[in-house]
Amino acid sequence: QYTVLTRSPEQAKKNLPVSVRLISSLTELTTLDIFDAVINLAGEPIIDKRWTKKQKAVISNSRWDITRQLVDLFRASSEPPAVFLSGSAIGVYGDQGDVMVDETFSSLPDDFAAQLCARWEAIAQEAASYTRVVCLRTGIVLDAQAGALAKMLLPFKLGLGGPVAKGEQFMSWI
């Protein structure tokens, strides 16, 4: 059995099998004892709006708050799930130019994306006393129907597209 936390239960109901249990708030759970694993990919989309001070707070809190709530549920569980897969992003590395980076890289920059991800991961790691924690550092979504590529296609279709930056930068994508 799967349980999905969603802001839009009615929309999710149209897209998911009937056997999936839908909840709209973590307050509907008192522990995580019935689950084998928890996957947390929640968060305000980062490419939909300008990164104003207010929007940065929305982006940050949408990730940090739910992750903190999940850590509290792990803490309250007598038989917690075996693994907690929590979202993060390659933004944690910042722009490192030609430097190759991996999960052991520790010279994190002091910019919004890096600080957002570093704190998000730190909150998730608070569950490490109760379960195995894995932070999934995803990249930019390149899909014609969603993510960054969907946003970039229209200008190109109108003949207005061109190189992004100098064209020499690295870009990890999914």
Enumerate the predicted regions with their spans.
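NAD(P)H-binding glycine-rich loop region in Rossmannoid oxidoreductase-like domains
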Residues: Q11, S19-Q69
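Short, polar loop motifs at secondary-structure junctions
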Residues: L5-A12
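Catalytic helix-loop patch of NAD(P)-dependent Rossmann-fold dehydrogenases
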Residues: N61, D65, G97-C135
